[in-house]
Amino acid sequence: MFRAAAPGQLRRAASLLRFQSTLVIAEHADDSLAPITLNTITAATRLGGEVSCLVAGTKCDKVAQDLCKVAGIAKVLVAQHDVYRGLLPEELTPLILATQKQFNYTHICAGASAFGKNLLPRVAAKLEVAPISDIIAIKSPDTFVRTIYAGNALCTVKCDEKVKVFSVRGTSFEAAATSGGSASSEKASSTSPVEISEWLDQKLTKSDRPELTGAKVVVSGGRGLKSGENFKLLYDLADQRHAAVGASRAAVDAGFVPNDMQVGQTGKIVAPELYIAVGISGAIQHLAGMKDSKTIVAINKDPEAPIFQVADYGIVADLFKVVPEMTEILKKK
């Protein structure tokens, strides 16, 4: 039996929504916005109330202009200074605290990337609140869902903190539309440089393949490949479909590939349209990082491998025969 909410309850709920306001911390590289920020904006809009976005950097005018066009954002706050080079958390934290104090935001969030995981615990500590990490759903302005036990269980968290600080798993929310918005832009609160650390340099690996967390197709290899040289089989296959290449923790620990390729609970979380797992047994830590993929194809010679339990399509065969055959077929198409 359902009971209609009393008019007083509805008025109180509407009043609470009017007072909700969320600050999204933008992750970017000065000239381009990190895709996970768009997913975070979508999560923020589900809280109700006004959504603002804070952009800090050295030359971030283009990113700020792009954010003004994103659907769901009411205001873009821009802070430009040399100390924000590299988006160091030591410098960003005072800026975020000053912005929160000025506008009295009820929620502060960022993507659950290395950037967000490095920044938000510091912000929460300064606000003297407990942060919530890696949320996958929002039930209400004070109730969030996150995974525990390597993704095998869901935990619903009710947060009574005065300011809710949380990071968002990008694969759990659609990206916000990059057009249709008309947000205003203004300068953020000025803060004095902390200067307890200095950004020196960053060298990015250049590749014709897409970035792992944003790719539509991912080909990942495990210990079954037996060596780093054999990962060339996956590179050849991936190049036929403009796919990214990942790896299991076992392959990374064995020294086959660098750890920036690791997919899993302690690596990167991916949810591509197609995920091809080659020579991966399917430890729960790996499954936690890829089980939200739309279609999963597993190739393993062991028919009892756990990876087949989550796969949509399974091939029980020797990967050293199957993968080259797949590559040749795709080359002809």
Curated annotation (Swiss-Prot):
<feature type="region of interest" description="Domain I">
    <location>
        <begin position="20"/>
        <end position="204"/>
    </location>
</feature>
<feature type="modified residue" description="N6-succinyllysine">
    <location>
        <position position="187"/>
    </location>
</feature>
<feature type="modified residue" description="N6-acetyllysine">
    <location>
        <position position="139"/>
    </location>
</feature>
<feature type="modified residue" description="N6-acetyllysine">
    <location>
        <position position="164"/>
    </location>
</feature>
<dbReference type="GO" id="GO:0050660">
    <property type="term" value="F:flavin adenine dinucleotide binding"/>
</dbReference>
<feature type="modified residue" description="N6-acetyllysine">
    <location>
        <position position="101"/>
    </location>
</feature>
<dbReference type="GO" id="GO:0009055">
    <property type="term" value="F:electron transfer activity"/>
</dbReference>
<dbReference type="InterPro" id="IPR018206">
    <property type="entry name" value="ETF_asu_C_CS"/>
</dbReference>
<keyword id="KW-0813">Transport</keyword>
<feature type="modified residue" description="N6-acetyllysine; alternate">
    <location>
        <position position="203"/>
    </location>
</feature>
<dbReference type="Pfam" id="PF01012">
    <property type="entry name" value="ETF"/>
</dbReference>
<feature type="modified residue" description="N6-acetyllysine; alternate">
    <location>
        <position position="232"/>
    </location>
</feature>
<dbReference type="GO" id="GO:0033539">
    <property type="term" value="P:fatty acid beta-oxidation using acyl-CoA dehydrogenase"/>
</dbReference>
<feature type="modified residue" description="Phosphoserine">
    <location>
        <position position="140"/>
    </location>
</feature>
<dbReference type="InterPro" id="IPR014730">
    <property type="entry name" value="ETF_a/b_N"/>
</dbReference>
<dbReference type="InterPro" id="IPR001308">
    <property type="entry name" value="ETF_a/FixB"/>
</dbReference>
<feature type="binding site">
    <location>
        <begin position="263"/>
        <end position="266"/>
    </location>
    <ligand>
        <name>FAD</name>
    </ligand>
</feature>
<keyword id="KW-0007">Acetylation</keyword>
<feature type="modified residue" description="N6-succinyllysine; alternate">
    <location>
        <position position="158"/>
    </location>
</feature>
<feature type="binding site">
    <location>
        <position position="300"/>
    </location>
    <ligand>
        <name>FAD</name>
    </ligand>
</feature>
<comment type="function">
    <text>Heterodimeric electron transfer flavoprotein that accepts electrons from several mitochondrial dehydrogenases, including acyl-CoA dehydrogenases, glutaryl-CoA and sarcosine dehydrogenase. It transfers the electrons to the main mitochondrial respiratory chain via ETF-ubiquinone oxidoreductase (ETF dehydrogenase). Required for normal mitochondrial fatty acid oxidation and normal amino acid metabolism.</text>
</comment>
<feature type="modified residue" description="N6-acetyllysine">
    <location>
        <position position="62"/>
    </location>
</feature>
<feature type="modified residue" description="N6-succinyllysine; alternate">
    <location>
        <position position="69"/>
    </location>
</feature>
<comment type="similarity">
    <text>Belongs to the ETF alpha-subunit/FixB family.</text>
</comment>
<keyword id="KW-0496">Mitochondrion</keyword>
<dbReference type="InterPro" id="IPR029035">
    <property type="entry name" value="DHS-like_NAD/FAD-binding_dom"/>
</dbReference>
<feature type="modified residue" description="N6-succinyllysine">
    <location>
        <position position="301"/>
    </location>
</feature>
<feature type="modified residue" description="N6-acetyllysine">
    <location>
        <position position="75"/>
    </location>
</feature>
<feature type="modified residue" description="N6-succinyllysine">
    <location>
        <position position="216"/>
    </location>
</feature>
<feature type="binding site">
    <location>
        <position position="223"/>
    </location>
    <ligand>
        <name>FAD</name>
    </ligand>
</feature>
<feature type="modified residue" description="N6-acetyllysine; alternate">
    <location>
        <position position="59"/>
    </location>
</feature>
<keyword id="KW-0597">Phosphoprotein</keyword>
<feature type="modified residue" description="Phosphothreonine">
    <location>
        <position position="93"/>
    </location>
</feature>
<dbReference type="InterPro" id="IPR014731">
    <property type="entry name" value="ETF_asu_C"/>
</dbReference>
<dbReference type="InterPro" id="IPR033947">
    <property type="entry name" value="ETF_alpha_N"/>
</dbReference>
<feature type="modified residue" description="N6-succinyllysine; alternate">
    <location>
        <position position="232"/>
    </location>
</feature>
<keyword id="KW-0285">Flavoprotein</keyword>
<feature type="binding site">
    <location>
        <position position="248"/>
    </location>
    <ligand>
        <name>FAD</name>
    </ligand>
</feature>
<keyword id="KW-0249">Electron transport</keyword>
<keyword id="KW-0274">FAD</keyword>
<feature type="binding site">
    <location>
        <begin position="281"/>
        <end position="286"/>
    </location>
    <ligand>
        <name>FAD</name>
    </ligand>
</feature>
<feature type="region of interest" description="Domain II">
    <location>
        <begin position="205"/>
        <end position="333"/>
    </location>
</feature>
